[in-house]
């Protein structure tokens, strides 16, 4: 399954607030469609599927990518759910979004893919790059690159920069000072349900 490129508010009406997908708020609180307002009892599978979809749409990853992240999270020590969230939070496109360089995760991914971002002084156009403590993420020294980032920093998607990221707005650069902690994940998600969803599939 490829990345979603359709109407974003349609997704947030169904799944709730997804700060990484869009900064717009849905006018209607019920799911789209003819029977959107009807209250139906959801199965346990449907609830787990919904949590999984939240994760996929918020971070803009494909189903295949998410399966890979689940496998990596399982192989690491500690809670699989927490490990999964940390892997997604440490993606370069998400870090650029959390810093305010991009208005959303898709917007930040475009910055990365178009070569506007450097990691440790080298242009890095791989959105899935895993940022680690000590990495310096900066906007490339080009007029067009700086203009894009400065415009986005005026109206960041999220108000607060996580404590593990040290942002220098004047230099349009930031340093990863520590590993991301669970409390700095901006998405309201029950990651255990995601792990349960994949328990028989992966």
From Swiss-Prot:
Residues 90-152 form the S4 RNA-binding domain. The lineage of its organism: Bacteria, Bacillati, Cyanobacteriota, Cyanophyceae, Synechococcales. InterPro entries: Ribosomal_uS4, Ribosomal_uS4_bac-type, Ribosomal_uS4_CS, Ribosomal_uS4_N, S4_RNA-bd, S4_RNA-bd_sf. SMART domains: Ribosomal_S4, S4. Part of the 30S ribosomal subunit. Contacts protein S5. The interaction surface between S4 and S5 is involved in control of translational fidelity. It comes from Synechococcus sp. (strain CC9605). This is Small ribosomal subunit protein uS4. Residues 15-42 are annotated as: Disordered. GO terms for biological process: ribosomal small subunit biogenesis; translation. NCBIfam families: PRK05327.1, rpsD_bact. It comes from the Bacteria. Gene3D superfamilies: Ribosomal Protein S4 Delta 41, Chain A, domain 1, RNA-binding S4 domain. One of the primary rRNA binding proteins, it binds directly to 16S rRNA where it nucleates assembly of the body of the 30S subunit. Belongs to the universal ribosomal protein uS4 family. It holds the Pfam family S4. Keywords: Ribonucleoprotein, Ribosomal protein, RNA-binding, rRNA-binding. CDD domains: S4. One of its GO terms (molecular function) is structural constituent of ribosome. One of its GO terms (cellular component) is small ribosomal subunit.
């Amino acid at each position: 399954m490829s990345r979603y490129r359709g109407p974003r508010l349609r997704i947030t009406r169904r799944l709730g607030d997804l700060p990484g997908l869009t900064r717009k708020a849905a006018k209607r609180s019920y799911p789209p469609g003819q029977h959107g307002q009807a209250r139906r009892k959801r199965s346990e599978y449907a609830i787990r599927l919904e949590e999984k979809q939240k994760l996929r749409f918020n971070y803009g990853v494909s189903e295949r990518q998410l399966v890979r992240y689940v496998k990596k999270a399982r192989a690491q020590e500690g809670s699989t759910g927490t490990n999964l969230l940390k892997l997604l939070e440490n993606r370069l496109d998400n870090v650029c979004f959390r810093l305010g360089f991009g208005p959303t995760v898709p917007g930040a991914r475009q910055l990365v893919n178009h070569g506007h971002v450097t990691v440790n002084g080298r242009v890095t156009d791989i959105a899935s790059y895993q940022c680690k403590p000590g990495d310096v993420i900066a906007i490339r020294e080009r007029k067009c690159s700086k203009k894009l980032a400065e415009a986005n920093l005026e109206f960041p998607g999220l108000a607060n920069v996580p404590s593990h990221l040290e942002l220098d707005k004047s230099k349009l650069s930031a340093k990863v000072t520590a590993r991301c902690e669970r409390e700095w994940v901006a998405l309201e998600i029950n990651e255990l349900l995601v792990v349960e969803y994949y328990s028989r599939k992966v």
